[in-house]
Amino acid sequence: MSLRVAVVGSGPAGSSAAETLVKAGIETYLFERKLDNAKPCGGAIPLCMVDEFDLPPSIIDRRVRKMKMISPSNIEVNIGSTLKDDEYIGMCRREVMDGFMRDRAAKLGAKLINGTVYALDLPKSSNQPYTLHYTEHREDGLVGDNKSLQVDLVIGADGANSRVAKAIDAGDYNYAIAFQERIRLPEDKMAYYEDLAEMYVGNDVSPDFYAWVFPKYDHVAVGTGTMRVNQAKIKQLQAGIRARAAKRLEGGEIIKVEAHPIPEHPRPRRVVGRVALVGDAAGTVTKSSGEGIYFAAKSARMCAETIVEFSNGGQRIPTEDELKIYLKRWDKQYGMTYKVLDLLQTVFYRSDATREAFVEMCSDIDVQKLTFDSYLYKTVVPANPLVQMKITAKTVGSLIRGHALAPTRSW
């Protein structure tokens, strides 16, 4: 037999899965409903992703080597002095990166289908196929015919609003709302953001997350995020970041407005039968940072590698238990990272006082090195005991001082 796999969604997750599968000689169908889609996203990727996923310099708009953390009382902390000359955070436009990764998978042999999957029929037995029903889109932009495809396995890489997840009753998760404006700045203003990104914290920009100004190709992405319970306030919070960064954004022109949900924890069920969820569909976005691009691509690759392994290179159909090994490996490798970032958000994002403490703590060189090493290389890097004791003591001191620094506001 020859294994047939459908990958629904061609962002970093779907394209990574498709590439891994097709390299192993597995018949792979890659679905994308909108080939020119520009997903709302800060667009930051860690250094390890560039090498690990063989990303060319052409898709990286900016190499950020400096960060500013800006507290509720507008105290600024500069971060980046611990970076080596060849270290940076890559800033990308999702439409550029996604297009590159999707095209690469297609050139390697994945069958790219420009269509919207609207239903998934589940098999009644373990040896029957899954049937995907989809509407094909034509090159002229018009809706084409309704079609169907039968496959042995399905990978759901179709984002936070995953239809694949709904089809297998994967369960819901809490999510945040990200709102972002792309703003083209005058040349002198854009020069300020040449290799600099900014993160703002405070109740005025988000009661439970942060706001950002990230540089892109010829503009900046200015946005904020908040949990869905505060969704009605999102435009008020966006006005908050625009006000805080007003001088630096002066003369800017809004060229695009975007909004998108961000998962806040994994779905209750990520593998059901012979269907596996990856990326945002699975809920791999980290708390505290809201980062999802690397973890989306990595989860998808690990899922696809598991399929290759247990299908003997496409010669048999893996079982549900075999697919779940991908989750065990994922949780073993990254479980601690998620726990640490969850704790960080719980401790430091709960009030303006704790946010003041967080920004102050970021001024410490040991904290900066620990944070950047963990971000750039995607590991929770343990500090030596003396450094850890020092960081703990500074954290306590910062929390105490933060209560004195926090601005008094009524909302």
List the predicted regions and their residue ranges.
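Beta1/beta-strand and adjacent pyrophosphate-binding region of the FAD-binding site
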Residues: M1-G11
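Glycine-rich FAD pyrophosphate-binding loop
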Residues: S10, V22-C41
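N-terminal Rossmann-fold NAD(P) dinucleotide-binding loop
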Residues: G14
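N-terminal FAD cofactor-binding segment of flavoenzymes
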Residues: N37-P72
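Short beta-strand to alpha-helix junction loop
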Residues: L83-D103, M227-Q236
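Predominantly flavin-linked oxidoreductase catalytic cores and closely associated redox partners
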Residues: R104-L249
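FAD/FMN-dependent oxidoreductases across multiple families
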Residues: V229-I307, S311-N312, P318
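C-terminal helical "tail/cap" subdomain of flavin- and related membrane-associated enzymes
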Residues: V308-W411
